[in-house]
Amino acid sequence: MAPGGGGGRRDGWPARGRLLLAALLLLWTRAASGQSSPQQSVILGMRLASCNKSCGMNPDGIIFVSEGSTVNLRLYGHSLGDISSNLISFTEVDDAEAVHNSTNCLELTKDLVVQRLVNVSRGNTSGMLVVITKFLRRSENMKLYALCTRPRADGPWTRWTDKDSLLFMVEEHGRFLPLWLHILLVMVLLVLSGIFSGLNLGLMALDPMELRIVQNCGTEKERKYARKIEPIRRKGNYLLCSLLLGNVLVNTSLTILLDNLIGSGIMAVASSTIGIVIFGEILPQALCSRHGLAVGANTIVLTKVFMLLTFPLSFPISKLLDFVLGQEIRTVYNREKLMEMLKVTEPYNDLVKEELNMIQGALELRTKTVEDIMTQLHDCFMIRSDAILDFNTMSEIMESGYTRIPVFEDEQSNIVDILYVKDLAFVDPDDCTPLKTITRFYNHPVHFVFHDTKLDAMLEEFKKGKSHLAIVQKVNNEGEGDPFYEVLGLVTLEDVIEEIIKSEILDESDMYTDNRTRKRVSVKNKRDFSAFKDTDNELKVKISPQLLLAAHRFLATEVPQFSPSLMSEKILLRLLKYPDVIQELRFNEHNRYCVRHYLYTRNKPADCFVLILQGKVEVEAGKENMKFETGAFSYYGTMALSVAPPDRSPALPTPLSRSASLSYPDRNTDLTSTSLAGSNQFGSCILGQYVSDFSVRALTDLQYIKITRQQYQNGLMASRMDNSPQPTFDGCATCSENFMERPELPPVDETTTLLNERNSLLHRASEEETI
């Protein structure tokens, strides 16, 4: 077999030129195929296809293969067939330059065994030649071979002279470790790569400031971990250099071991890349980013050991970084960043909304001024300095709900004093004391602040205890004339606290939910003291508003028959203001036992309830005629207000009298209970009338409340109508007229006209329950 262009090119064309030449020769040989012998094969060139070990092309374009490998060479030519493998062999040459000196194949080598030609193309223009390389001798590490061909089986061998026909066989690098140890070492290096990569992210992400916080307020396990990590984390650059050096060293060693284990080529690159990326980067960093504290604490010994091993290199580098870059900047949050961090992390922390609002309010304290939270001057409740502290003025003060009230003179902007409600504790409204007398006596200081005062400074002033109310003012220099202080409003400690907690504080006396929006409190148990003011046209007996208020509250709270569940407070007040309900009795010193001194007489019918307001009475009760004295706020005849029908037994007994007066603290209650137990003090019922079995006689001048049974029953019906109004029926007009004709009843109001049959049934049922 003659080599096509077998004379060779001593200067060695580039690969592209050689392939082009081979293609032209192939076309030429096909054109001349009619003149060639059908048995003659022509080889134009060869290239490396594959091998089972390390192989490839060196920079000079020469094929190199490993010893003891199977190599597949792709041959190009004409009329290639199975017999062509007998026409191909290799000869050993000294070097690549000597190939060009001769074309003789003096001695064929046995180190390369040509097997066969396979996968011949349909046109017999290419095929795959299988060559087996034997192992080199111990003293040899490489050999160079040249391709030899012959035109026929008995023809002479001709050596190719170009570099494309050369083949290097190199020594195979054996494993320097046993296979099991090699695999184990690769696994250990993968683990170390993951540890260093994870620690690099986990430890460096732990801020030293955060570690100090965890040491103080973390769980017991977190505190333990933080105490271990914090000393080495303070050496930030030294730790960083040590971890990076360890990571690079481990990854480099791992790549070399994988290359030696798998062999060079695409498989070695792919396996090392996949192993390092997945097991050395992704998994450990994903783990340490979530559990860096625990991983760093449990691997602290390994970290310290490697820091010690890399000390000669990593420590100088870290010092250089400290010098060039400066000390590590730690995470410090200012006020705005801290508030934003709390807002962003709200879904993940355990702070409730109220706690978050308090923290936010406290952080904003230094950014707000008193002008932002003050109550405008025109919205403030104030009192004139020349006011008289009578019942009307004091009731107005009580209804305002404020405990500190500014006192102004001439105009509201001229605040001269502060009145505390507690200053009025010993003031009797009947004395009509001038307000100036009280303010001059206590002389509370008036605290003024400027409108641009920050809330934190205002809070510090309030904490000093001087005052919990301050007058907000500013310097007004607008227009012509000298500047002057202009009062803008009031600010209190409550306003500052509300701004801190970001919520309104409502106590039992507040009338507004917000002093800026002036939104009123929706539901308040507000006491209207104006109803107790002096009305001479309603009361025949002169009684002070304070005593009327005390009697009203005593009946509503201490006497079950007048409790708000039975009789509304509004109806009770009307009842007390009705003519002849509040009466006076002048005591006759010359005739102590005259008939008019007796409010109740034993064994005589009575249809009224009596509450002593002022004075003393003597009560005689029981079979033993036990006598004792009582005073103000003792009451009698509760059973007379509702008497059981004749066909019904009396109700369960209730005490004949009770006293809420503090004037008799030394009353002998044992004697009272003994005397009451010894007699039938509850009276009896004869044909629907209440008959008292005790006597009550005046000992001094008396002022007392006397409510008849009919007045009480009318009050109950009016209360029911107020609570549940009923539609008007035809018969109600007649009932209202009869109700008006009774002289002892109070004036008929609009609810009385709504009485109907249903009210009558309710009235009878109420009488039975009361009895």
Swiss-Prot record:
It comes from the Eukaryota. Residues 175-355 form the CNNM transmembrane domain. Residues 1-175, 283-290 are extracellular. Glycans are attached at N119. Residues 238-258 dip into the membrane without crossing it. The modification Phosphoserine is found at S657, S661, S766. It holds the Pfam family CNNM. One of its GO terms (molecular function) is magnesium ion transmembrane transporter activity. GO terms for cellular component: basolateral plasma membrane; protein-containing complex. Cornea, retina, teeth (at protein level). In the retina it is predominantly localized to the outer plexiform layer, inner plexiform layer and ganglion cell layer. In the tooth strongest expression is observed in the cell body of the ameloblasts. Expressed at high levels in the gastrointestinal tract and testis. CDD domains: CBS_pair_CorC_HlyC_assoc. Residues 374-435, 442-508 form the CBS domain. Residues 197-237, 259-261, 314-771 are cytoplasmic. It is a multi-pass membrane protein. Belongs to the ACDP family. Shares weak sequence similarity with the cyclin family, hence its name. However, it has no cyclin-like function in vivo. Interacts with COX11. Probable metal transporter. The interaction with the metal ion chaperone COX11 suggests that it may play a role in sensory neuron functions. May play a role in biomineralization and retinal function. This is Metal transporter CNNM4. It comes from Mus musculus (Mouse).
